[in-house]
Amino acid sequence: MAVLGITVALLGWMVILLFISVWKQIHSSWNLPPGPFPLPIIGNLLQLDLKDIPKSFGRLAERFGPVFTVYLGSRRVVVLHGYKAVREMLLNHKNEFSGRGEIPAFREFKDKGIIFNNGPTWKDTRRFSLTTLRDYGMGKQGNEDRIQKEAHFLLEELRKTQGQPFDPTFVIGCTPFNVIAKILFNDRFDYKDKQALRLMSLFNENFYLLSTPWLQVYNNFSNYLQYMPGSHRKVIKNVSEIKEYTLARVKEHHKSLDPSCPRDFIDSLLIEMEKDKHSTEPLYTLENIAVTVADMFFAGTETTSTTLRYGLLILLKHPEIEEKLHEEIDRVIGPSRMPSVRDRVQMPYMDAVVHEIQRFIDLVPSNLPHEATRDTTFQGYVIPKGTVVIPTLDSLLYDKQEFPDPEKFKPEHFLNEEGKFKYSDYFKPFSAGKRVCVGEGLARMELFLLLSAILQHFNLKPLVDPEDIDLRNITVGFGRVPPRYKLCVIPRS
């Protein structure tokens, strides 16, 4: 029995030595960036805090430098940390790293749409979507009008609270939801509409679940875990329900399509599909259009909604900042006129606060995973084709040289000594390069106009002492999720 135990131990040790030898051989032959030694099957999982992987990446960067390799399970991942490495990757090597690393929870969207697509249709779908969105006013006067009109509905909903405590999640969320719905479907929803609330709850739940430790594990071990119970099943179910809804809307549009008079984003894609239908490899199908619309709907709603919700919580914590914003709004806009984009140049403090909210909350700290499209030499290392590459946006947004005291909320990070707005090239919450967020212009406009409109008409009132408000996120993974809270909005006299 003792001999058997010794034999098993020796065999186990030999397997480990063999693994080390093979790992070193692969590592040296490719000249990969340095990194911690991975264990069989689990890789470097034990060296990462699943409750805050971005922070773990920061610690590893201190040890191995701004470009390092980790293994998430069997997946080789190259992490880029700091302004120089991230900027070089996103802008100077944007083609080589334009692939999308797989996110198993969104496998149903694989090679479709524009966010999670890593297939041959991605470039053309993205290019045409951007052109179509510009035609419907993305970042221009058309969307300013849409946001201003929707802001009126938001202000009315806030008045209905009559100064009583309420959870802002869906009240605030319905505004960007309706703005993007108008672009996609030429439709808007009442703030109490059951279908709208259902879709927003799916968006909100998925953003939360994707940021939990279990989903970090699942996305790296999906081959082992896909048939096991867990919250990943809920995410996948939610994704399917969202796609079923957008597919139904696409089919409705298809039945009533008039190619001479496109009504919205869906119609424009359907017209292109009709032009392409005789191709042996059609770029557009009803399924691909539905996923593209689902991508836009989720991203266009949840990111702006969460940023606004987090921003209001920050202002509850800092009433002195809210007071300065009221003064600037009163001076530039006055009590009755709706805020406009042209006001931004005269409102440097509001502009700085909006930027600082995005920097401080660091909504998607590790970006979405990229993938090397070919063998690439980067800062003296070789990154093989198919390698997942993560450019950490938090390493820019929390850079201590660019933003002194980055852990503190300070609008002064974006103001010069004269009190004028100061842009920072480190400000990349929407990423950059080939995979930059297609809705950046819309989101920036929404944040400025909606926050200005809310503060033009209301004072924010917390339910607890501002010093007791905790701004820490409740979980971080795919994104940073703010704590749930209630507040009161008091009409300004």
UniProtKB/Swiss-Prot annotation:
Q: What is this protein's expression induced by?
A: By ethanol.
Q: Which residues bind substrate?
A: 298-303
Q: Quickly give the catalysed reaction.
A: an organic molecule + reduced [NADPH--hemoprotein reductase] + O2 = an alcohol + oxidized [NADPH--hemoprotein reductase] + H2O + H(+); (5Z,8Z,11Z)-eicosatrienoate + reduced [NADPH--hemoprotein reductase] + O2 = 19-hydroxy-(5Z,8Z,11Z)-eicosatrienoate + oxidized [NADPH--hemoprotein reductase] + H2O + H(+); (5Z,8Z,11Z,14Z,17Z)-eicosapentaenoate + reduced [NADPH--hemoprotein reductase] + O2 = 19-hydroxy-(5Z,8Z,11Z,14Z,17Z)-eicosapentaenoate + oxidized [NADPH--hemoprotein reductase] + H2O + H(+); (4Z,7Z,10Z,13Z,16Z,19Z)-docosahexaenoate + reduced [NADPH--hemoprotein reductase] + O2 = 21-hydroxy-(4Z,7Z,10Z,13Z,16Z,19Z)-docosahexaenoate + oxidized [NADPH--hemoprotein reductase] + H2O + H(+)
Instruction: Report how it sits in the membrane.
Output: Peripheral membrane protein
Enzyme Commission designation: 1.14.14.1, 1.14.13.n7
Part of which pathway? Lipid metabolism; fatty acid metabolism
Entry keywords, A to Z: Endoplasmic reticulum, Fatty acid metabolism, Heme, Iron, Lipid metabolism, Membrane, Metal-binding, Microsome, Mitochondrion, Mitochondrion inner membrane, Monooxygenase, NADP, Oxidoreductase
- GO BP term, pick one: xenobiotic metabolic process
Record-linked Pfam families = p450 (PF00067)
In this chain, heme is annotated as bound at 437
What are the record's GO terms for cellular component? Answer: endoplasmic reticulum membrane; mitochondrial inner membrane
Cofactor(s) recorded in Swiss-Prot or TrEMBL = heme
Task: Tell me the protein family, please.
Answer: Belongs to the cytochrome P450 family.
Q: How does it assemble?
A: Interacts with chaperones HSP70 and HSP90; this interaction is required for initial targeting to mitochondria.
Q: What is this protein called?
A: Cytochrome P450 2E1
Q: What is the protein's species of origin? A: Oryctolagus cuniculus (Rabbit)
